[in-house]
Amino acid sequence: MKFAIESVSKCSGRLGTLNVKNAFSNVSISTPALVLHAKGGSIPFLSREVLQYLTAETPIMQHSLTNTDHMEEAVRACDEGISSFVGHKESISLLVLKDPAEQCKPSFHEKDFVPIFSRSGRKNFTSERYMQLVEAFKPTVFVPLFDGDTDLESSKKRLQKSLDRTEKFVEQCVEAHRKSANLKESNLIGPVVGGYNLKLRSASVKFLEQFKNDLEGYMIAGLHSNGLSATELKESNLVEVVSHTCQSLPTDKVRFMFGAFSPRIILKLVAQGIDVFDTSFAYLKTQQNRALTFSFDVNDKNVDSRETELDIRDPRWAEEFTGFVESCSCLACTKHTKAYAHHLYNTREMLAPIILMMHNLHHYFEFFKAIRKHVSEDTLDQLVEHLQKQKDVPLFDEKSVDVTKADPMDFRDSATKKLKV
C-alpha cells in the first residue's frame, strides 16, 4: 500500500492518492475518500450486481471482526481469503475490530485480551488468537488488536490502561506479522489511542514511531462508542484532538478515521488532514428510513430552504412523485419516487431499504467528489458554511399521525394495522 500526497491546502486539508493491490487487482483511489462499510462480507441491502450500478471502480470493503468472526472456519477452508470467500475477490479488504455502525457494549477489559461481541456472544481475543484469524482472512489491510473502547466520558485511568494494553497488543501483532508467511502481502495500519487526552495521544503516536517501517498508515481511534454516538459528537472537542494527533503523525502516511460522522463533522475532519472514512453513516440513515438530501452545491440558491434528510415514513411524501433529490442521477431517483418509497415502507416491502441504500451511498460518494474539488481549490470553508445553512429534520414520530384522516383505500385497521375482515 502506497500513499502519495498531491497537494496540501492552507485551510482545507490535503489531496492524495492511495494505491493498494491484492492478487487480483490494483486499486488507486483519490483522497479524501470512502471505504464501503460491510456486514457479514456484503454491503447491507445491496447485491454485488446492484453495487456495480453505484460504482464501476474496484471497492475497498471494510470488514469488522464483530460480524465476520463466525466465518473463520469456512474462510480458512477456502484458503483464498475473505474477499474471495464473500464473492468480491477483486475488492480490497480492510479488517477492523468492531463495526462502526454498531454501538459498543460496555464490558470489563482484562490486560491480555479484547472483548468482541458478535452474533454468537462475547469472545475474548488475545493477540495470538486474533492473528490466527487474520491469517485465515488474509486481508489486504488490517489493524492490529487494540483497546479503543473510550470516549469523552472515559477517565484518565481508563485512558492510560487503554494505551498500555494497546502498546502490548501492537508489539505482539507486529511481531507475528513479521514472521507470517501468509501475511507478506497484507498491510498493517497503526491505531492511535488516548481518548480526548492530548498527552496520551502524543504518547501513542510516539510509541508507534518505532514501527514506522511496519506500518503503512494510521487509524485514529478511541473517540466514540460507534453507532449513532459518532453522529452526536461535540465538534470542538473532536477537532482539537484530531488536529493535535494529525500534527504529530508522519505526513507521508495515510490517515483513517472510522465512524458514522455527520457531513458537517466530516468536513471538519478533512480540514484537519484525515484521508479515509467509511460509509456507515449512509447505512445508519437507511436503517432510520431516511434519505440523504443535503446539498453540496455551493451555487444552490435555495439552500436556506433545504433539508438535510427526508423520512420516507412521513405521510407528506405520499403524493410526491419525484425522486429523493431533484438533480440526483442514482438508479433510485431516476426510476422511483418519494411516494413509491413511502408506499414501500407502509407495506413493509423489502425494496424500501434497498432503494434508500442505493441513493444514500450514491449521494455520499458524490459528496466526497465535491469535497475533493473544494480541497483542491482551498474553498472547503464555503462548503462548511453551505451545509450549516441547511435544516436538520427530527425523526418522524409515527404516533403523531392522525388516524382519523387515514387513507380511505387503506384496508388495514387503524389500531392493529391488520387487514380488515
UniProtKB/Swiss-Prot annotation:
Keywords: Cytoplasm, Metal-binding, tRNA processing, Zinc. It is found in: Cytoplasm. GO terms for biological process: tRNA-guanine transglycosylation. One of its GO terms (cellular component) is cytoplasm. Its cofactor is Zn(2+). Disulfide bonds: none annotated. Pfam families: TGT (PF01702). One of its GO terms (molecular function) is metal ion binding. SUPFAM superfamilies: tRNA-guanine transglycosylase. It comes from the Eukaryota. Zn(2+) binds at residues 328, 330, 333, 359. InterPro entries: QTRTD1, Queuine_tRNA-ribosyltrfase, TGT-like_sf, tRNA_ribo_trans-like. Binds 1 zinc ion per subunit. Belongs to the queuine tRNA-ribosyltransferase family. QTRT2 subfamily. HAMAP family: QTRT2 (MF_03043). Heterodimer of a catalytic subunit and an accessory subunit. Non-catalytic subunit of the queuine tRNA-ribosyltransferase (TGT) that catalyzes the base-exchange of a guanine (G) residue with queuine (Q) at position 34 (anticodon wobble position) in tRNAs with GU(N) anticodons (tRNA-Asp, -Asn, -His and -Tyr), resulting in the hypermodified nucleoside queuosine (7-(((4,5-cis-dihydroxy-2-cyclopenten-1-yl)amino)methyl)-7-deazaguanosine). This is Queuine tRNA-ribosyltransferase accessory subunit 2. It comes from Aedes aegypti.
